[in-house]
């Protein structure tokens, strides 16, 4: 069977936030990088499909800056290395703003839109076509021990001229001062549905964090992905990430 090649930015999954959610989320939050500063999120994902020929590795870097206070710009890149076939490089540019900021016992709402650059665009669990947008909504508990996130959006695949609606829902909960847990579901109207759970640990609170996550498709998506040799459509994945979030740069 010929291997269908799909770039790594087209399925995730953190960038969320930014184009993925704050690591290790795929579902984005209605928050921005600290005003007057930048942050860097980088991670490696190991895709472990049931067929060895469909396994792959991904390497990601997503710097984001917020120079004005309510306008965040993200420039991201990913390198995908399948076990068989050529490697892929993908790039994304995204802008994000908030209509309402998050506070304890209250909700926030924003808008994000972006463009993915890759010669072969094919949306997958990362919720990307050539162009995309989404509305991130978040709600924080009074004590901020947990925060809920919901995303609704759409994507336009320029190659197939198809439009798809995308969705995501997740919860982050504060275990203690250094540990944070996450769980989420996300997918699109093509039938793709995925779950992911993860942990984040603060080496230096509010500055340097490491994380890890585990996820896989479920329902029709799980059946479809196990029956095809897709380098970026695995039955399951595990990822390891690093976040650098300084309080001020500019």
Enumerate the language-model features and the residues they cover.
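N-terminal signal peptide c-region/cleavage motif recognized by signal peptidases
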Residues: 14-16
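Sec-dependent signal peptide recognition
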Residues: 1-11
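Transmembrane beta-barrel domains of Gram-negative outer membranes and organellar outer membranes
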Residues: 19-250
């Amino acid at each position: 069977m010929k291997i269908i090649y799909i770039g790594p930015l087209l399925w995730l999954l953190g960038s969320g936030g930014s184009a993925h959610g704050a690591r290790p989320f795929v579902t984005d939050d209605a928050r921005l990088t600290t005003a007057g500063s930048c942050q860097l999120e980088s991670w490696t994902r190991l895709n472990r499909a049931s067929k060895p020929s469909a396994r792959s590795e991904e390497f990601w870097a997503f710097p984001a800056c917020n120079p004005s206070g309510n306008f965040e710009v993200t420039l991201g890149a990913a390198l995908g290395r399948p076990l068989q076939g050529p490697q892929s490089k993908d790039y994304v540019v995204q802008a994000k703003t908030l209509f309402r900021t998050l506070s304890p016992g209250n909700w926030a709402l924003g808008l994000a839109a972006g463009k993915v650059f890759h010669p072969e665009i094919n949306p997958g669990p990362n919720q990307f076509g050539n162009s995309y947008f989404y509305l991130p909504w978040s709600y924080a508990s009074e004590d901020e021990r947990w925060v809920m996130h919901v995303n609704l959006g759409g994507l336009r695949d320029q190659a197939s001229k198809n439009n798809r609606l995308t969705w995501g829902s997740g919860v982050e909960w504060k275990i203690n001062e250094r540990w944070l847990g996450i769980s989420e579901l996300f997918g699109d109207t093509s039938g793709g549905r995925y779950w992911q759970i993860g942990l984040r640990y603060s080496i230096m609170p509010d500055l340097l964090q490491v994380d890890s996550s585990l996820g896989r498709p479920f329902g029709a998506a799980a059946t479809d992905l196990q029956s095809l040799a897709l380098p970026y459509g695995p039955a399951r994945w595990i990822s390891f990430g690093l976040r650098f979030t300084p309080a001020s740069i500019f």
